[in-house]
Amino acid sequence: MKYKIEKNTVQETLILPLYSRKLCTELYPNLYRDETSVRLLDQIDYDFSEAEKNSRSLMQRFGALEVAMRQNDLAFEVRAYLKNHPCAAVVNLGCGLDNTGRACDNGRCKIYNLDFPDVIALRQQLLPAGEREQNIPCDLKDPVWFDRIDASGGAVFFASGVFYYFLTRQVKALVQGMTDAFPGGVLVFDAANRTAVKMIAKTWLRTAKIKDVGAYFAVSDAKSELSPWDSRLQVSSRGYMLGYNDLKDPSVSGFFRFLAKVGDNGMKMQIVKIGFGDRQ
């Protein structure tokens, strides 16, 4: 049975990133593989004609490369944490239909996928929780979900394309709350500077009728801007296009490598890593 997805629904917003990840897998097979997206799209009844028409455009192909690098970078940080904390909680914040937690599974960690209730309802149908895994419906801004996470073996949290939709004060409150609740844990997420966030926000802010783009979370220098939030934070960052991979692969053109450099340096597209120091 195929799951029908209607246009202009919350479910549709989950399908398009899935399509991007499938496109990455096809265009950049040496750099990125996401078999889950390929499998899930076979189970979905949705009109992909528009996405397919745009899929070979220059910006769509570069956008697919961005998605691939972001997922790879976050998975790298999750695996790095699990090397020292093999029984840790691996927590996907704003998971959608992303299966990074399962892709990083070492056979001992606990996997948590968090998102709004309607998103989790669809996820339960398409990606039911497996062994040592929970799909948790919640609002990330409400810390009530903290109690659902067993962090006795440590905790690594990651958020992909999520915090662009948060106000700076909301991200700050979340980070401060997590620092108290999960000492020794780590949070990794993608971020960009104000210019890039304005570009990202152009479409959805118009529909949401939000005027003050400046209130939304953006970062240029993560260490100097975020460290003052709490003395226990250990903040670092790396460019998200070239910080983990030089992209010297036959599937990536020289022009795309140039755009990647512009993204990392001009737009400050980065993976931010925040370590929560132990209680003082």
Pin down the residues of each PLM region:
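Short alpha-helix
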Residues: V213-Y240
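A short, conserved alpha-helix within the catalytic core of class I
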Residues: Y165-M178
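Conserved beta-strand signature within the Rossmann-like core of class I S-adenosyl-L-methionine
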Residues: M178-R194
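Rossmann-like AdoMet
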Residues: M1-V91, C95-C138, A151-S152
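Short, glycine-/aromatic-enriched active-site segment of Class I SAM-dependent methyltransferases
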Residues: K198-V213
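Conserved catalytic loop of SAM-dependent methyltransferase domains
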Residues: R232-F258
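Short amphipathic alpha-helix with an adjacent loop that forms part of the alpha/beta core around
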Residues: P143-S152
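A conserved beta-strand element that flanks and buttresses the S-adenosyl-L-methionine
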Residues: F157-F158
